[in-house]
Swiss-Prot record:
This is Forkhead box protein J1.2. It comes from the Eukaryota. It comes from Xenopus laevis (African clawed frog). Key transcription factor required for motile ciliogenesis. Activates genes essential for motile cilia formation and function. The lineage of its organism: Eukaryota, Metazoa, Chordata, Craniata, Vertebrata. One of its GO terms (biological process) is regulation of transcription by RNA polymerase II. Keywords: Activator, Cilium biogenesis/degradation, DNA-binding, Nucleus, Transcription, Transcription regulation. GO terms for molecular function: DNA-binding transcription factor activity, RNA polymerase II-specific; RNA polymerase II cis-regulatory region sequence-specific DNA binding.
């Protein structure tokens, strides 16, 4: 690569003509005076970049010239060019100006109304003040409230009556004047520290009560459980008839387990347990089938019981004397012997709607009673 030096400089007339013709192009005249042999890298690193002249073209290289965009790298060394930044003026924090609230009527005091009341009570020797005395102390010590709208007095009254830190003390008979006094409640006296009324944090039990403590009334689909309801018996026509076991309601099986244990806690509905309202048609059909079967079984049972009682009375009229009646008083009757003990159905413990489909039909249950 030929090295440009001063010996290759063109005549001055030719340079002037080229400058006139190529004013729109980037000026590269500094390349003619550049020589790699005479350059000092240390001086280039410490020197500031030259300020472009007005006559020079734009600083960005022309399109397609990628040589000036990226400098060659030698190994892993990196040359950093320090730039001499002008020292920026540092913003010094402005000193906080103390405001005299007794004379300055344009600045509102940064205290709450409850704090103002506490400050007035602390300044008093008796630690109890009337409402008018609290007004006077605030207006004397804070000029803002002297010229402000008198609506702030309503806020003072509301804080005295609603804030639990203040309590009203009745006026004694020997004390002149009208109205009662206001003072701080001794239980909350520790909240007023260094002229500021602090607020206590609510305990976690009040902020997040457990959801399981919510109780509900009887659900319309849940049967009301009564103690001893499964052991009651009906007496009809001189013969005792055992009461059939109540079938569980298949509408809401998820609520039956808490009800059997006597628990009234609210349990959220689980959509996987089949208690959604989408299955109301199927559940209503199952309930109607169960009720029809129960009615048919009860009618057949009542007719069979009545016929058996009439047959016994017609067949054994001469044997009903006092001696036979007394001898059979401690024994079980024929119908009691025939009766089978009512066993609690296993599906009452599970709570699935599908158990209703596998229940024995009503005509088979009638045969067991005969």
């Amino acid at each position: 690569m030929p090295v440009l030096s001063t010996t290759h400089r063109l005549p001055l007339s030719v340079e002037r003509e080229r400058n006139r013709e190529d004013d729109s192009l980037t000026n590269l005249q500094w390349l003619q005076d550049f020589s790699i042999l005479s350059t000092d890298l240390s001086s280039i690193a410490n020197s500031r970049p030259p300020v472009p002249r007005v006559s020079q073209g734009p600083c960005s290289p022309p399109a397609g010239d990628t040589a000036s965009c990226q400098a060659p790298r030698t190994g892993k060394q990196r040359v950093t060019v320090p730039t001499a930044w002008a020292s920026l003026p540092t913003l010094s924090p402005s000193p906080v100006q103390e405001v005299d609230y007794r004379t300055n009527a344009n600045v509102k005091p940064p205290y709450s109304y409850a704090t103002l009341i506490c400050m007035a009570m602390e300044a008093s020797q008796q630690r109890k003040l009337t409402l008018s005395a609290i007004y006077n102390w605030i207006t004397q010590n804070f000029c803002y409230y002297r010229h402000a709208d008198p609506s702030w007095q309503n806020s003072i009254r509301h804080n005295l009556s609603l804030n639990k830190c203040f309590m009203k003390v009745p006026r004694g008979k020997d004390e002149p004047g009208k109205g009662g006094f206001w003072q701080m409640d001794p239980r909350y006296a520790d909240m007023f520290v260094n002229g500021v009324l602090k607020r206590r944090r609510m305990p976690s039990s009040h902020l997040d009560p457990p959801r399981c403590n919510k109780t509900i009334g009887h659900h319309p689909y849940l049967p009301v459980s009564r103690p001893g309801s499964h052991h009651m018996q009906h007496i009809s026509g001189g013969h005792r008839q055992s009461r059939r076991y109540e079938k569980p309601n298949p509408v809401l099986p998820a609520f039956r387990a808490p009800e059997r244990q006597g628990d009234t806690l609210f349990t959220p509905e689980d959509p996987l347990q089949g208690s959604n309202f989408d299955d109301l048609d199927l559940q209503a059909a199952l309930i109607s089938m169960c009720w029809e079967g129960d009615l048919a079984a009860s009618n057949l049972n009542s007719t069979l019981t009545g016929n058996s009682g009439m047959d016994m009375n017609q067949q054994d009229p001469p044997m009903q004397d006092n001696h036979w009646y007394l001898s059979t008083e401690g024994q079980q009757t024929w119908e009691q012997v025939k009766e089978e003990p009512v066993v609690e159905q296993w599906y009452s413990e599970t709570g699935f709607v599908e158990d209703v489909l596998y229940e024995c039909p009503p005509w088979e249950r009638v045969e067991t009673l005969l």
